[in-house]
Each structure stands twice: as structure tokens, then as C-alpha cells.
């Protein structure tokens, strides 16, 4: 039994051992397979075909292929064994594949034999082969246009290689079916062609006079000849011939004073004719050199403006008007600017040496304040002289000053477009320092104001009220020091060594006669005006800006909406503005906000030329456009003229004793000065109204400043021995006003408010010497503002002097006329010869009949005389005011005397004096006599509906 079990066990072991020895080899397959599967199909065609071989064949199980295993993430395929004996297999898609989703698939496959099944411990597996499966496309999608409607514009008369391009796309994945092979224009008889890329061109020159808009339809085909499902529409507009230029601007731009900032080009746009640009630069230039000194500034005089701006006093005029006390300017050529200021011309061979001490106000002794703390102020118009070029310096001022420690020296020169200030704090020890500025204003041949503040070691230069720090500071220690002698020269400078230039005999050398001769060189060539120096205290920046800054110019404030890449630059004088950018639309927006601004309420009217120049850079230099220059002008309109109205009592009489008093009689005791601006508006739509409605409002504060008033005489000048005009000098000096008192006029000059001028003019008095035989005077008062630009009406005041006459005996036939005689009147000397002496100096008492006869005769004579007086009055009213200067201008006024015969008639002027005191009126209101009202009409201001500047004769102040 035991032997039987052992034999069975050995038999099974031998069988197993023989089976293991039979499955010796692994299956074999190709290393790589290429497969193709059609879209929407599942069978993969492999190259080479899928076969697995096993060298253990024909053994059962060991030589058979049981299957293929696929390896990869998300492989949408599966492997199928077709024949185990031959090892043939097949790869199929689990579901139809989509080429548009994935065109290619890559994975690995592995074959295994049939021993113990695919996962058996004794199963043999082949190596892993790579399988590439490409999904073949099917033309299932039609072309689709990117846009349904295409628009373009062309210029007439041109043939274009490409007007626009239409584009269609296809959703298929393969190049064969996804590419658009050609386009086609479906609309017949159109002058356009389309190529296979969708580019449309015109076949003939299009004319704007013909068809202005072309419409046609295009379609597309893919390479599988599948037509687009929806066709596209094309519209091409024909435009007239394009000229690159600025469009939408006005040549004439009107500016109303007081309007603030006014846009110059609110609707401007740049037409580039479709030429692409990558850089645009425009320059706007405002020409104001013809307005006063370079631009519109405050219209007040220099003296008045200094007071308004709060400038400190104490400046010394170094180039005053030639006169007995200022003869050093007599040899210079004198000109006058539009604002009547004095201008000196230096021709390059002239200079003036200002005497120290005396009228110049610069002492010859120590001048500590002037040595290191002072302000130089002057106007200059200078250009580069062609003969000199930029090589030679030109000296504006040169000064050596004596102080307690020794001598200091400074000079101000121009060199081309550079201005330099050389300062030598102490000639004995300190080294000179030179401050340099490079400014285009120095050499542009335009008027500019310069103010130099020295507070050593700080030096600040102001040009037209704008401060500039020095560009360079040099330590010029090698310069030879000038001679230690006080001297001040304008227009040139002396050389460092005595007689150095004189010995050379240079043509540009002149000797002065102040002390020892000084050789002169570096002459100035240009214009200077308003040259002054003030020592000890510097002018502040605010004061200098108020005094000399331009009140008009170009302006740009819309920085918040300034586009990206835009640059804006305005020069200091605001006469030049530059814009730079790279986008046309952004550039247009920026240029539309460039404005003109004039801060003066009463701007100088006239034309300001305007120029816009443009430079562009294109992507294509060959076809780059050129933008023509734009020229226009700003018209500053006439401002609404302020109407200065003087009013008060125009006629009064006083006893002579009042005029002979120590204070005289006030001429304008109730004077009123008003200033207003009248604006004329249209009348309301009312049939019963025939006139216009005028809206008058008070002017702003600056208008209420007067800069001068004049009291003149109508008729003969004042006789200083018998009469005079008086004013309180202390009150004038306290307010900084100047008084000029002549026999023909009295003037008050200086900027002050209307209230101050009213107060001062009410103190103006007329005084007579005791016993002066004067009976009537007429005075004319007028005022002005803004350097005499606007004048008031002429307010005329008539004054009658009432004289008393000593009581004398009268003949009986004139007793009844005693009611016309004032008890205190005294006949004037010139009428004494016509007085009637009494023929009855005895003590006889006449009878009653005689008295009655005398009274009747006297009454008859009185009636005749009154009739003659009335006839004479009517005659004077018709013939005008042709009477003597001493007579009253009022024919109806009883304050008169008339000598027309041997009789002397004295009319009591006090009879109507009370009526005149209550009934007299000034220019503003009240009732006047008929003849006075006709005279006053000429003196009144213009009617409120007239917008004009009042023309007046030149003033004496």
C-alpha cells in the first residue's frame, strides 16, 4: 500500500516538471504599431497587423495566445483576440471617437499566453509595444465667418491692394477640412475682387461723385468644398480725396474780458487719412509781443502798481528821465512804449556812469545794505547781435561799492542766451562767485522783466515774475579784481587794469570823466527800461509776481483726464504750449482743452495771432503724412468801460469874507464819486415798450481805485497874488499821494480808493486875498483810473463871490430901488465911475408932491431897466455863453451885473441864494437852470447803454 502511494506521488511530480519545461518562451509582438480610426467609427486599422507569436507552439496552452492587455490612462480602446492559435488580435474603440476632441491617442499593449490564464503565476507576457492611433477627420462642419458684417472706407481715385479682409473658420480638425480653400463674391457686377485669403481689392478707381456706398455678399469654402452655412455682408464707403489736416477749428476766436479760461479748439480733430502714426507733437504759439511789453499786464503805471502790490518803497531809478538833476541819461536814445513808459536804446557803443550821491540816491560813502542785500529790477529787450555773435559778453550793470570793511563789486552780463551775475563780496579777501542762468527769454528779442534778489550767498532771478535758480555756480578766483573806487555804470563795464584797453587803442573803448579815466568794454546792445535798485530789503516773490507777471497766456488744466502717454509743456511766459502723444484720439482730446486766459478785468483789446504747428512720425516713412500749419487769432473784445461819475453841488455863492478866511471855501463839499459798468440787454417783448432795458451793476473792487484827479480852471489861470487853491499836504503824504499845484491846474496822483479821493477832494478849498476884486470862477474836476485809460465826466463848479458895498446917499428917484440893494454890498472899483452921486446934500425936506413925482419917475425908470435886463437875458440865452469870463453862465440867474450904459444897476444876488441852496443839483440829480442843464449834458458820462471807453485828453498826472 505504501509503495502504491509513493509511486502515484512521483508520477504527479514528473507531470508537473514536464509541463513547466514545455512553457519556456514568452509571446512576441512588434515593438510599435501605427493605427488609424475613422471619426465616428470604432475599428482601428493597425500597421503592421496585430499578431503575437510564441515559440512554445504547438503545445497546448503554452504555445497559445490568450489575449492582449492595453496600458495607459483613460485609453478609449480595447484589444480583442481573434485566433489563439495564430495570435491574431484587433483593437477597437470602446465608443465612436471624435477628432475635434482628440486627434491622436498613444498607449502600450502586451500579449500573454494561455498557461494558467492571464493572471496565472506561470503565464508568460510579451514586451510592451507602443501603439499610435490617429483619428481620421470627417468633413462634418461648414465654414463660419468671424463677422456677419464687414465695413471699410476708401478714398476716391485710388487702387488699393487690400481694402479689407474677411475671415471664415471651420470646426473640423484636419487640415483638409478645417482650412478655407477659397472665397467668392456672390453679388454680380461689383468692382471688387476677393482672393483665397479673403482680401478684397477694387478693380477700378472709385469716384465719390458716383456710388458712395457699395454693398455685396461673400461666401467661403473649405478644402472639402463645403460652403459656409451663412454668408457675410460687406459695405465699402467711398470718401472724397483725403488731405491730412486739422479739422473742426475756427480761425477767429473771440474772447470777452473777464471770461476766465476759453478753449481755443473745442471741436478740433486730426485727419490722418488712415495713415498709422506712432508719435504726434504739436506746438501752439500765442503772439503777444505787440501788446505793451511782451504781453498784457496790469494797466496801472509802475508807481501805482507798486502801491497796489504792496511793494516796499525806497527804490532808486538809475535811468530816469533826462533833466537838470539826471543829466547822465541825456546822451541815450529815448523811446516810449505803448504804455507811455520811458525806454532807452543802447547801441553797443554807449554807456552811462551814474553819479554817486545827490539825485541818484546812492551815496558815495559806505553802502552796507547795497553790498549784500539788494534787488535789481529792470525791463530788457535783447537779441544776439549778428556782428558779435555769442562770443562777447555784454554788460548790463557794473558796480563797485564801498562799505565799512572795504570794497565789494558786482556785475550783471548777458552772453548769447545766458545771463550771468558776478559777485565779489570783498575785493581784498573774498573770491568772486559767478551765477549763470540759461534762458531763452534773454535772446528772443522780446520784452521781459528781470528782478535779481541778492541775499548772499543766495541769488534768485525772476523773469516775468517766475523765479529761476542758477544753472551753474562758478568760483572765479583767478579774475583780476577791479580798481578799488566806487563807480556805477550801466551799459558797459570798466576793465580790470587801468588804461589796459586804452593802450591797446581798441575801437570799442571809451573813457569816462568821473575821476581818472576808466577803459570801458563789453558794451550792451539792446533796450533797457525801468532800471531801479533797492537796498536793504528784498522784494518778495509774491510782490514780484504781482508786479510783472503776464496776465494772459495759454493755459491747460485738464490733467485729470489726460490720456496715457500724453505730455504737456508750457513755457514760463505761457506763450508756447507743446503737446506730445502717440494716440490720435487721446491727442485730439488733449488739444481740445488748450485754452487762452486773461486775468485782467479790463484786458487790452486787440488781436493775438495764434499758430499751431504739428510734426508726426509714421510707421511707414515712405507714406508718412505732413500736417499743414494752422493759423488763427484771438480777438480780445473791448471791455465794458467803467463809468466814473462825479456829482455834487454845481453852483454856489458865498460872501467874500468866507473866501478871505484862512481856510477858504470848500469847492466840492458834497462830492460823490461812483463807478459802474453798464450792460445792455434786449428789451422785453412788450409792444408798448420802445426802448431798451439796461442792467447796471457796480464794478469789482479793483475798478474802485482811482489813480489821479485834476482840478483845472475854466477861463483865466489863477492869479497867485489874489487867489489860490488849497489842499491838506499832510493828508496826501500820509496816503502816498503826490500833489502838483500850478496856476492853471491842481493834480493829485497816486492809486487810492474812491472813498479816499472823495475825502481829499472835499477838502479842496478856494481862497482869496483880502480885497481881491473877483466875483465869479468856474472850476473843472475830472478823475481817471488805470493809468488814465478810463476817465470820468468833467464836473464843473461855478463859484460866485458876494461883495459888500458901503452905504452912500442915493437920489430920491432911486429910493424905490433899494429893495434890490444888499446893505452890506460895496460896488466894485471898476464900477465906481458909474455910480450916481447924490445931488441933494442939503438938509431941505422935499414936499409931498415932489416926493410922489420922484417915486413915480423912479418906478417908471425901474420898469424900463427891468425890461432891458430881460431882453438882455433872452439875447444871451440865444447867442450862447459869449460873455466875459467873470460873468455868470446862467442868463436867468440874478447873480449878475451888467454894464451897458452910463447907468449902473446892482442886482441883489442874495435874493435867490436860498432858492439855489435848496434847488441846485449836481450831475447826478437835482434841477438846474435851463441853460445849465444844456451845458451839463456835455459833461455827463455817456448813457448807460453805450459800451465804449471814454476818450479824454492826456492827463497831467
Swiss-Prot record:
Membrane topology field: Single-pass type I membrane protein
Bias type Basic and acidic residues, positions: 944-957
Acidic residues biased stretches: 928-938
GO CC entries: cell surface; dendrite; endoplasmic reticulum membrane; GABA-ergic synapse; glutamatergic synapse; Golgi membrane; lipid droplet; organelle membrane contact site
Extracellular side: 20-848
Signal peptide region: 1-19
InterPro entries: Cadherin-like_dom, Cadherin-like_sf, CLSTN_C, ConA-like_dom_sf
Every Cadherin domain range: 29-145, 146-246
Record region (Disordered): 916-957
Matching CDD domains: Cadherin_repeat (cd11304)
Chief location of this protein within or outside the cell: membrane
UniProt GO BP: adaptive thermogenesis; chemical synaptic transmission; cold-induced thermogenesis; excitatory synapse assembly; homophilic cell adhesion via plasma membrane adhesion molecules; inhibitory synapse assembly; negative regulation of excitatory synapse assembly; negative regulation of lipid droplet fusion
GO molecular function: calcium ion binding; cell-cell adhesion mediator activity; enzyme inhibitor activity; neurexin family protein binding
Subcellular location: Postsynaptic cell membrane; Endoplasmic reticulum membrane; Golgi apparatus membrane; Cell projection, Dendrite
Membrane-spanning residues: 849-869
Gene3D superfamilies, per the entry: 2.60.120.200, Cadherins
Cystine connections: none
SMART domains: CA (SM00112)
A Pfam family per the record: CLSTN_C
PROSITE patterns attached to this UniProt entry: CADHERIN_2
Keyword field: Calcium, Cell adhesion, Cell membrane, Cell projection, Endoplasmic reticulum, Glycoprotein, Golgi apparatus, Lipid droplet, Membrane, Postsynaptic cell membrane, Repeat, Signal, Synapse, Transmembrane, Transmembrane helix, Ubl conjugation
PANTHER family assigned to the protein according to its UniProt record, in alphabetical order: CALSYNTENIN, CALSYNTENIN-3
Subunit structure: Interacts (via cadherin domains) with both alpha and beta isoforms of neurexins (NRXN1, NRXN2 and NRXN3). Directly interacts with APBA2. Forms a tripartite complex with APBA2 and APP. Interacts with low affinity with KLC1. Interacts with SLC23A2/SVCT2.
Function statement: Postsynaptic adhesion molecule that binds to presynaptic neurexins to mediate both excitatory and inhibitory synapse formation. Promotes synapse development by acting as a cell adhesion molecule at the postsynaptic membrane, which associates with both neurexin-alpha and neurexin-beta proteins at the presynaptic membrane. Regulates the balance between excitatory and inhibitory synapses by inhibiting formation of excitatory parallel-fiber synapses and promoting formation of inhibitory synapses in the same neuron.
Similarity field: Belongs to the calsyntenin family.
Record-given protein name: Calsyntenin-3
Biological source species: Rattus norvegicus
